[in-house]
Amino acid sequence: MAMNVSTTIGLLNATSFASSSSINTVKILFVTLFISIVSTIVKLQKSAANKEGSKKLPLPPGPTPWPLIGNIPEMIRYRPTFRWIHQLMKDMNTDICLIRFGRTNFVPISCPVLAREILKKNDAIFSNRPKTLSAKSMSGGYLTTIVVPYNDQWKKMRKILTSEIISPARHKWLHDKRAEEADNLVFYIHNQFKANKNVNLRTATRHYGGNVIRKMVFSKRYFGKGMPDGGPGPEEIEHIDAVFTALKYLYGFCISDFLPFLLGLDLDGQEKFVLDANKTIRDYQNPLIDERIQQWKSGERKEMEDLLDVFITLKDSDGNPLLTPDEIKNQIAEIMIATVDNPSNAIEWAMGEMLNQPEILKKATEELDRVVGKDRLVQESDIPNLDYVKACAREAFRLHPVAHFNVPHVAMEDTVIGDYFIPKGSWAVLSRYGLGRNPKTWSDPLKYDPERHMNEGEVVLTEHELRFVTFSTGRRGCVASLLGSCMTTMLLARMLQCFTWTPPANVSKIDLAETLDELTPATPISAFAKPRLAPHLYPTSP
């Protein structure tokens, strides 16, 4: 049952997280807007009441919206919005609610049963995506796959990805490039030990992911000269920082996404962050793509070496290039943005949790010694036999998701989820945070416990029952779950097999507090790594 305005305001005051310096300006704008169209509001309310009376099922519960603008004042006032939404659902004791932002129905879900209704039973209905500034910027004008509305362009690009780019055969073809970056990870961490430095696990994990994708796409690790110790140079740091900025603001509750007439005013500052981050990513990548296209045109390049070559050489039925340069550039940018975050975030958190529970760290290392031994380095071929290591990663995905919500699924027609009516155009989002921590699904949900995943046969990182979200599922699910699983497992396995990890000197316990406006550790996790294998097994060059 929807709450009245006074109840809602009381709830908001109780769950306030932060205030923006621009609140007063925005409030004035909304008050002026409200006064100027009061007569229209009355008409809309009457129309909505008549329409509501014709429905057989109620809308999901939620806060009473203000006329026309919905709950945008609350969205602005109580930043970060995702924490306000999760607290709202907790206080309402509901696994589904409906929050009105402008004319958009935002429907978060934190129950696996309802999540499966959306992405399995009603997958075809919820296959669309919303149009927002962040999605348009990431996709170069909706030329790619992940954030593109359900249309012919999406069908074309997804078919190319699944058949030519992310296929099992292509994954096998690119194995050696991934292996090079697993070796470079060990080289980099070993050099931190030689220099008597702690390892910044955020730096190590994020740049391992960036290195893997750059090597698979461009056959190179560095945009610049790189660093002698195998770590990122200034160019790679700027590039990866831009990737994570683009991710932070993707569907980030930007005001103009819900009130499009405000686009360009950048009232909450998000528009500049989005545009600048996506420009930085392309400033590094596009010159390499242009150069490679010219090499193929001139005949200088004749053999395929990486994914960029595959994109460029794809032909249509008439023998013409299947993709335009803009499609290639933007799809590669989207691949970079979409593949680095999940593995790096999960393993930074996993290492922090395991450092605070050394018995888990010990058990995972013992599994590696038993399955792989100490006479060679762990390889991708070992992954099927490393169930406990995978359980450690899987538990990090559950407890510490990289994003609060998954990418929105827009209803293409009126439908029913649970016992609630969901109008056409609603944004249904799975709460990654809420699903993974739902006490109705998980016992002791805030405890990091890999053992909870060890009684299900072979451990995998995918979760098709949607008890939590790793790579999602359905026709709009991640097409690169095999790649993501390999990157995640190899990252953790190499770190555990090759080094003994301890907290930094004078630190007895790793701080696992979350950043307020993200789900990353508030302080990047650092630890000291000591080699535990024979010296000849450690790579000696980047």
UniProtKB/Swiss-Prot annotation:
EC category name: oxidoreductase
Keywords from the named record: Endoplasmic reticulum, Glycoprotein, Heme, Iron, Membrane, Metal-binding, Microsome, Monooxygenase, Oxidoreductase, Signal-anchor, Transmembrane, Transmembrane helix
Family: Belongs to the cytochrome P450 family.
Tissue specificity statement from the Swiss-Prot or TrEMBL entry: Expressed in the epidermis, the next two cortex cell layers, the endodermis and the pericycle of leaf petioles. Strong expression around the laticifers among the phloem cells and in parenchymatic cells between the protoxylem and the metaxylem cells. In the leaves, preferentially expressed in the mesophyll cells adjacent to the epidermis.
Stated role: Involved in the biosynthesis of the cyanogenic glucosides linamarin and lotaustralin. Can use L-valine or L-isoleucine as substrate, but not L-leucine, L-phenylalanine, L-tyrosine, D-valine or D-isoleucine. Catalyzes multi-step reactions starting with two successive N-hydroxylations using L-valine and L-isoleucine as substrates leading to the formation of N,N-dihydroxy-L-valine and N,N-dihydroxy-L-isoleucine, respectively; following spontaneous reactions lead to the production of (E)-2-methylpropanal oxime and (1E,2S)-2-methylbutanal oxime, respectively.
GO MF, any single term: valine N-monooxygenase (oxime forming) activity
Annotated residues for binding of heme: 478
Membrane topology per record: Single-pass type II membrane protein
Substrates-to-products reaction catalysed: L-valine + 2 reduced [NADPH--hemoprotein reductase] + 2 O2 = (E)-2-methylpropanal oxime + 2 oxidized [NADPH--hemoprotein reductase] + CO2 + 3 H2O + 2 H(+); L-valine + reduced [NADPH--hemoprotein reductase] + O2 = N-hydroxy-L-valine + oxidized [NADPH--hemoprotein reductase] + H2O + 2 H(+); N-hydroxy-L-valine + reduced [NADPH--hemoprotein reductase] + O2 = N,N-dihydroxy-L-valine + oxidized [NADPH--hemoprotein reductase] + H2O + H(+); L-isoleucine + 2 reduced [NADPH--hemoprotein reductase] + 2 O2 = (1E,2S)-2-methylbutanal oxime + 2 oxidized [NADPH--hemoprotein reductase] + CO2 + 3 H2O + 2 H(+)
Activity regulation behaviour: Inhibited by tetcyclasis but not by 1-aminobenzotriazole (ABT).
Positions of transmembrane segments: 22-42
Catalytic activity, EC: 1.14.14.38, 1.14.14.39
Name this protein carries in UniProt: Valine N-monooxygenase 1
Pathway info: Secondary metabolite biosynthesis
Known cofactor(s): heme
Annotated glycan sites: 278, 506
Record topological domains on the Lumenal side: 43-542
GO biological process entries: cyanogenic glycoside biosynthetic process
Location in the cell: Microsome membrane
InterPro entries attached to this UniProt entry: Cyt_P450, Cyt_P450_CS, Cyt_P450_E_grp-I, Cyt_P450_sf
Major subcellular location class: membrane
CDD domains given in the database record: CYP79
